[in-house]
Amino acid sequence: MKNLRLKAARAALDMSQQQLADAVGVSRQTINAIEKGDYNPTIKLCVSICRRLGKTLDELFWEG
């Protein structure tokens, strides 16, 4: 399932996939795969992404 919330949060900060990837220590391809729903990130990576984007885990990753 695509993660449109992650993509929207990143775009709202005018941040590229590469900028987010650099900030959390992964490749741009990893961020792309997460946004496309092709990769299930570790909880550690989820937390890093949330901190960088100023969002909670619930806001970006959990269905509900």
Spans of model-derived segments:
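DNA major-groove recognition helix of helix-turn-helix/homeodomain DNA-binding modules
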Residues: 44-59
